[in-house]
Amino acid sequence: MNVLQLLGVNRVINAAGAETPLGGSVLPPEVVDEMREASFIFLDMHELLNKAGKRVAELLGVKAAFITAGAAAGLTISAAACIAGKNIAKIKKLPITDDMKNQIVVQRSHRTVFDHAYMMAGARLIEIGKPFIYNKREIEGTINDKTAAIAFTVTGRGIVSLEEYFEVAKHYGLPLIVDAAPVIPPITYPRDLCKNADLVVVSGGKALRGPNDSGIICGEPDLIEACALNAHPNFAIGRPMKISKEQIVGLVAAVELYVKKDENAEINKWFATLRKISEILDSAPNFEKKIVFPDEINRPVPRLHIRIGRNKVWEVIEKLKSGVPKIFTAEYLTMDYYPDSLVIDPTTLLEGDDEIVADRLLELLKSLGG
């Protein structure tokens, strides 16, 4: 039985990066094998989560870790841990938090579509600053007896350093939560972030190539214990964010594989892919092309930028998606950072995809007068 064929759902070409709407990443065969083995047996989920978290923490070089059903779930559970802690009575009340410390301070330029995940736990977000104007004293001015935590997002926007945030958090005895979903590579980044944070949330389904619906909370052991109490399989706010034994085992296997990977060799491969695409597009000389490195959050990830112009770039993006196979590019980068450019991310291109992308793009660019 071929379910995809039965449903009439065809594969797409992912030149956007490891994005949830496109299925995250492609699982290595070793990860699939481990998940398959786990699917045939029953396990004590408390024991599995506990031991899997310890192993992942060891591999990443952090103090403690907890596995979640994706990074967004990790934000919700982190917020719950900061609000309710290990108090069972409070845990059972979430998301009703009126009688608890329930405010989380966040810089306006760090607001994202994902910060509603904090609110799902009953948090009230207290926004500070203008998007690109910030005074450190603004954080201190918002802290009161209802403040539960401070939140930071690893992003290409904002002018507040993580170190400044952490300094304020420590001074007031508040936990600092970092949304670091896409920060790998390098694999050392979560460990480095934990030096200036109490909880760091990382996606398991992006560069790690674990299941798309997996994530990791790294951080201080006491708070990680609180995360576990507020999460599945307990009857808590995290119960609907259930993570299966297959996901847990698959994520551990993915991390085991990744820490043995030669990141520099992979980066060089990405550069070669982009250079190949760029050379094919030389036949459309009217459009400027450049490989940008590092990326917006300073990861060692190269991307190819093709300057098409604000008036035409979305026309090209939509035509790529309407073809067979559909080709998706890094639309969020066009939308948020580079409004006149189409951006190709090589990290999720499969073998042979580069030529298909280049040929289709060349055809479209020539139709625009390239």
Locate each region found by the language model.
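Generic N-terminal amphipathic, Lys/Arg-enriched alpha-helix
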Residues: R11-P21, P29-S39, R299-L304
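An acidic intrinsically disordered interaction segment
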Residues: R36-L48, I216-I217
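A non-catalytic, amphipathic alpha-helix used as a structural packing/dimerization or gating element
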Residues: E37, K51, R55, K269-K276
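Flexible, glycine/charged-enriched surface loops at secondary-structure junctions
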Residues: M45-N50, A64-F66, G238-K242, K261-W270, ...
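A common structural junction motif
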Residues: N234-F235, K321-F328, E363-G369
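Active-site pocket-lining segment
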Residues: S244-R307
